[in-house]
């Protein structure tokens, strides 16, 4: 699935892989002052540096068309006073404004990290430790985050596999024992069609996948924002595997050596 961590070095995956997914909120980077943007960028760099070479992770940005009954997150808690009716009315107004400004597109952000382990019992303590660290690091950035449980992850994948559909997600853990089916049976669409070379079909919806290779020496910090602001249902994923510093330096030196050889060969022509 798109929310499971991507494959990395084979030696990391000789054992089973266990994952966790967190949903996190946005940070107002684009409207911040230049000074605040610098601080946010530094904090984000520190957040990324937490993940070492043994902890691959994936960032997922999911844009989906809102359905009737879907709820935008507006956190205005009720209080023990006589103004709750005003709060309710104001919350409804904000949700309507958000829906209009987003053209009906709901935008969600996730981070999924994975660890190799012999079994669930061995994986759980480290997963929980990493989860606590990641949530704490988010909090230092002023970003709220929360883990998804198994059912919430299934619901998310169900939405990914039923784009444009109004089919509700129906699943309870007890259903597995009652039906004998696995979790995948509850989220799979009625059909897949991969006969086209540049597109595919999931149920009644057509889609396409693209791979972006960044070769530019400079990259605008607005690139991802501009992609995610497209008025379309789309998913952008970043598969990130930190490289050990010694190995990275060796790789860079090797690339420089290759470039020097190419220069010499060109000069001989």
Go through each PLM region and give its residues.
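Extended, folded cores of ATP/NTP-driven motor/assembly subunits in large transport
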Residues: 1, 6-269
